[in-house]
Design a protein with these regions (language model features):
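Generic structural motif recognizing short loop/turn segments at the entrances and edges of beta-strands
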Residues: 1-3, 38-40, 92, 115-118, ...
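Flexible, glycine/charged-enriched surface loops at secondary-structure junctions
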Residues: 31-38, 84-92, 163-165
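Active-site-lining helix/loop region of Rossmann-like oxidoreductase modules
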Residues: 1-80
Length: 165
């Protein structure tokens, strides 16, 4: 597959568009089911590129109130989720790093940021249709699968959902 790009990954685009809305949704207590959020609007196109590890995304965002580029970068760098606030063992200390070089993030250089548990963002620039566009990079097996599962377990334990019998 070296030297080739596959322009379709079955089921990946639908999953990428719907799964975040389920995560950002809420649980209907009466029905006992997840009600997905209705915003933001997410659309994507997935392409398989031959790299060992890492998912790279071209992201386009529009805000209700457009921030400056500097404000956007400041908010990304300041982001702190429950895993950081609880200082969980697997949690990256700095969840998002912003790389100023115009040729970053790169899989070879940046996929292992924060032991693979962090997200690298670069090339933030204004867009003619949306407010901004940027490139994001995350480790698909560390952050996205194995490490993500460990971090979820740590969070559930810290929040009291997992206890000893």
């Amino acid at each position: 597959m070296v030297g080739n790009i596959i322009p379709f990954i079955g089921g990946e685009e639908e999953k990428s568009e719907k799964e975040p809305l389920r995560i950002w949704g809420h649980i209907d207590e009466e029905k006992g089911e997840i009600v997905p959020a209705t915003s933001p609007v997410i659309t994507c196109q997935c392409v398989r590129v031959p790299v060992l590890d890492g998912h790279t995304a071209a992201v386009f965002v529009k805000f209700k109130k457009k921030p400056t580029k500097e404000q956007l970068i400041e908010k990304l760098l300041a982001f702190e989720g429950a895993p950081q606030k609880l200082n969980l063992p697997s949690a990256p200390k700095q969840f998002i790093q912003y790389l100023e070089e115009d040729n970053r993030p790169q899989v070879k250089l940046d996929v292992d940021y924060e032991n693979g548990m962090g997200v690298s963002v670069g090339r933030i620039r204004e867009d003619s249709v949306y407010d901004f566009k940027f490139i994001g990079l995350a480790h698909n097996t560390v952050r996205g699968a194995a490490g993500g599962a460990v971090l979820c377990a740590e969070l559930l334990k810290a929040q009291g959902f997992i206890t000893k019998k």
